[in-house]
Design a protein with these regions (language model features):
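Bacterial N-terminal signal peptides
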Residues: 9-21
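Sec/Tat signal peptide C-region and signal peptidase I cleavage site
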Residues: 20-28
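Second-shell loop/turn segments in exported
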Residues: 40-50, 82, 98, 114-125, ...
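Von Willebrand factor
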Residues: 31-98, 106-154, 181-191, 198, ...
């Protein structure tokens, strides 16, 4: 019998060409920007209407914040490109605001207005890997050539559907994409059957990757707007931050997280419910 792990590797290898970036970044059809940024936001069933509204409003406010605007326009080209995507289970990803160039405060306000105007709804399961793979495809033929390409993933639980999150992360990083994380630890110490108390460590070990990648945990919804603002300043700044200043959760080597914990929890509870 063909081993499952080998089969999965072969399938990913065949899928790889679909994720390769455009060959010529300098083509005249592509607009040069300092950063191409995918904001990938969790809307799985654990998110209620109020939480989803907080997320949308938090990003809209941050994108028009003076410090964030300064970061956007501080690079070599003085402009960035951003898209906003909501995600849940594998195959459940929805682009709320397509790629838009932001080169002025008016551009940023227009993006924020679109973000607040779009409908929001939640979906089943949590596929961080699906979000990363979909976000990776969004860079292809998007009309922009960024000096840096970043996927920002926010979520309140571990991956429990789709390919293993480490494989999706490694594929994106191998294509020159940086993945940053915003783990939402906003339950006040109460955890559901599919959640884990060490989501901050999980994001560091299993989700983020690439040069100067970072994870910025959010411990309460009251912290969310400021966390998003700070994260965007770091991601959009035209200069690299010293690694010592990046807000990464540091963990000891021996505390390496089980990156399949979400899948194991899902199997455990599905089996118990039979």
């Amino acid at each position: 019998m063909f081993p499952f792990t080998q089969l999965r590797t072969v399938l990913l290898a065949f899928a790889l060409p679909a994720f390769l970036p455009a060959v010529a970044l300098a083509q005249s059809a592509e607009r040069e920007v300092d950063v191409e940024l995918v904001l990938a936001v969790d809307v799985s069933r654990s998110m209620g209407a109020e939480e989803m509204d907080i997320q949308r409003r938090g990003y809209a406010a941050a994108l028009t914040d003076p410090q964030v605007l300064d970061a956007m326009f501080s690079g070599l080209t003085g402009r960035v490109a951003i898209t906003f995507m909501e995600w849940a289970g594998d195959g459940n990803q929805h682009v709320v605001v397509p790629w838009r160039e932001i080169a002025s405060p008016e551009d940023a306000q227009a993006f924020a207005d679109l973000l607040l105007a779009g409908p929001s709804y939640n979906m089943r399961y949590t596929s961080i890997s699906g979000a990363i793979l979909t976000a990776t495809r969004l860079f292809d033929d998007n009309g922009f050539a960024g000096l840096k390409r970043v996927i920002d993933v926010s979520g309140d639980g571990p991956n429990n559907q789709g390919v293993p999150v480490e494989e999706a992360r490694d594929l994106a990083v191998g294509n020159g994409i940086i993945i940053n994380g915003l783990p939402l630890m906003t339950t006040g110490g109460f955890y559901g059957r599919y959640s884990i108390p060490y989501l901050d460590r999980y994001y560091v070990d299993c989700v983020i990757g690439g040069p100067a990648s970072f994870s910025l945990p959010v411990k309460s919804w009251g912290e969310f707007p400021e966390a998003v603002r700070r994260k965007l300043v770091l991601e959009l700044a035209g200069h690299a931050m010293p690694e010592s200043e990046l807000p990464v959760v540091r963990v000891a080597q021996e505390e390496k997280t089980d990156c399949l914990i979400g899948e194991r929890l899902l199997l455990q509870w599905d089996f118990n419910d039979r």
